[in-house]
Regions:
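Active-site-adjacent betaalpha module
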Residues: 2-14, 60-234
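Short acidic, Gly/Ser-rich segments with clustered Asp/Glu that frequently serve as metal-coordination loops
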Residues: 22-27
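N-terminal nucleotide-binding beta1-loop-alpha1 segment
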Residues: 14-20
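A short alpha/beta connector and helix-capping loop motif
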Residues: 10-13, 28-53, 59
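Short glycine-rich phosphate-binding loop at a beta-alpha junction
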Residues: 53-54, 105
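The conserved SAM/SAH-binding core of class I Rossmann-like methyltransferase domains
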Residues: 18, 55, 132
Length: 234
């Protein structure tokens, strides 16, 4: 059976990690969540022999790649740039072309600036671009939301981290599946433990009537991919 061209394949994919630097990560509320998802993708890519490229923005002044991501990508190329679109950097464009891959899984920060500009330039250059919503972030949730809406409307495939990994794997029962499955199980276990911890903290708090501020904070804390309906609410 011929697979849909809208699905990723490990033979055609490259993972691009954009500007995961502490200076950009610190103001982001979902920093740990985003970085952990990027680590998972990087580790899965390494095990599946999928090329990985990373960028930094003006590293001399803004700092190097965050240590946890630098460790996850091992010796993959890291290209420093000043332009916001990665593809506008000639060294990066050369590295990307050298991979020979046509599908780009694009992750990093910020969703509405460097990720967005890079994705749209890659589309124009003929790449199929996939952006997992849970591996990109912005300082403000509304910026993240509208970036993903704009990308989706422009032809980018907005996806999820697990979707990406399972599309790479294609089927169960293989050596590749057995090699990557522990990463997925560890991620699920960590998420369950985090949820249980949150529930315990909530149960210890004194119940008070909700306020408008509390409702707004709860909404901001909820991470879900944007839709046209959610976009119209803002």
């Amino acid at each position: 059976m011929e697979r849909s061209e809208k699905l990723l394949s490990r033979e055609n994919s490259v993972l691009v990690i954009v500007d995961i630097q502490d200076v950009f990560l610190k103001p982001i509320k979902v920093r740990d969540f985003t970085v952990e998802n990027i680590q998972l993708l990087a580790q899965a890519a390494q095990r599946l022999q999928i090329p990985v490229l990373a960028t930094t923005q003006n590293a001399e002044k803004l700092g190097a790649l965050a240590p946890e991501v630098a460790e996850a990508i091992d010796d993959a190329p890291v290209v420093d740039k000043l332009c916001f679109s990665c593809l506008a950097s000639e060294p990066f464009a050369q590295h990307l072309q050298a991979t020979g891959r046509s599908q780009v899984v694009l992750v990093g920060v910020e969703a509405h600036i460097c990720v967005l500009q890079t994705a749209l330039d890659m589309l124009k250059a003929g790449y199929a671009v996939h952006v997992p919503y849970d591996a990109v972030a912005s300082r403000l949730k509304r910026d993240w939301k509208y970036a993903l809406l704009r990308l989706s409307h422009s032809g980018v495939m907005v996806s999820a981290v697990e979707s990406v990994v399972y599309e790479w794997l294609y089927e169960a029962g293989t050596d590749s599946f057995r090699e990557v499955l522990p990463l997925l199980k560890a991620r699920e276990q960590a998420r369950q433990e985090a949820e249980e911890s949150d529930e315990e903290e909530e149960s210890e708090e004194v119940e008070t009537p909700p306020t408008e501020d509390a409702n707004e904070e709860a909404e901001e804390a909820t991470e879900s991919p944007p839709t046209s309906e959610t976009g119209s609410e803002e």
